Amino acid sequence: MLRIAIQTKGRMHEKTAVLLNEVGIRLPAAKRTLLIQSNTFPAEILFLRDDDIPQAVANGVADVGIVGENEFHEKKQEAIVIKQLGFSHCRLSLAIPKEEEYPGLHWFFKKKIATSYPKILSAFLKKNAIEADIHFINGSVEISPGIGLSDAIFDIVSSGSTLISNHLKEVEIVMYSEAILISNKKLDEKKNKILQELIFRIDAVQTANDKKYILLNAPNDSLQEIFQILPGMKSPTIFPLAKKGWSSIHSVISEKQSWEIINKLKNAGAEGILIVPIEKMIL
């Protein structure tokens, strides 16, 4: 049984729950408790505060965890980063009052900076030879300059709307962050085998995220031109149609390129083009 620590609530919790469902880890519909066992995968889910997850994994309270890179780097716990998960993207940035002119990093010299991430900020300032006064605040960092607690802040930025509503502007991006899968360094063979299955399933879901399944009909004399348009994984699948001289072609394309590819296929004589989502892809 593999114990997976995830965030108790919030946006990352919601997206983590979606990922777990996509990889086949479904939880009972009963009221959530601190620890729940999956009925479809040899795992149990431990619900924790996001800043407690790195330590829980490092200490073996949980075997693996899903947490933001920002929390992992701030806590500096002895755990292994297995992979980035592609959601809950944000950045850790320095922000100052919007009316201030910003000539560069030296603006922060001897300034008071409020943050919930003192270790990351301290390392950044030291690297850039900036001496500043770091004030640790656990939450609501963005209000600090407005009430006179600090001159600037160092905090998570997603859309930037929170900064705007507090009359702040982002001036330096220190690091980018997203959800990551971390693991305890000393998993036994049985737990490691379950972890490898989990990684395999996550890879299958991630690979499919930007892919679409495409089906189309085309005259046989256009097949070679169409093959040049379709990237595919190896080569397109072809089925003869009842209509003489025509074939049905199946392949996989990138969603980002789908409209460009569709236009090229139409110009090459393709008809009846269907684009279908892919849930999982095993390469």
From Swiss-Prot:
* Family to which the UniProt record says this protein belongs: Belongs to the ATP phosphoribosyltransferase family. Long subfamily.
- What name is this protein filed under? ATP phosphoribosyltransferase
- UniProt entry keywords in alphabetical sequence: Amino-acid biosynthesis, ATP-binding, Cytoplasm, Glycosyltransferase, Histidine biosynthesis, Magnesium, Metal-binding, Nucleotide-binding, Transferase
Q: Which reaction does it catalyse?
A: 1-(5-phospho-beta-D-ribosyl)-ATP + diphosphate = 5-phospho-alpha-D-ribose 1-diphosphate + ATP
Phylogenetic placement of the source organism: Bacteria, Pseudomonadati, Bacteroidota, Bacteroidia, Bacteroidales
Q: What broad class of enzyme is this? A: transferase
Its Enzyme Commission number(s) read 2.4.2.17
Q: Where in the cell is it found?
A: Cytoplasm
Q: Gene3D superfamilies attached here? A: 3.30.70.120, Periplasmic binding protein-like II
Segments crossing the lipid bilayer: none
Taxonomic source organism: Azobacteroides pseudotrichonymphae genomovar. CFP2
Quote the PANTHER family the UniProt record gives. Answer: ATP PHOSPHORIBOSYLTRANSFERASE, ATP PHOSPHORIBOSYLTRANSFERASE ATP-PRTASE
Coiled-coil region: none
Name of the gene:
hisG
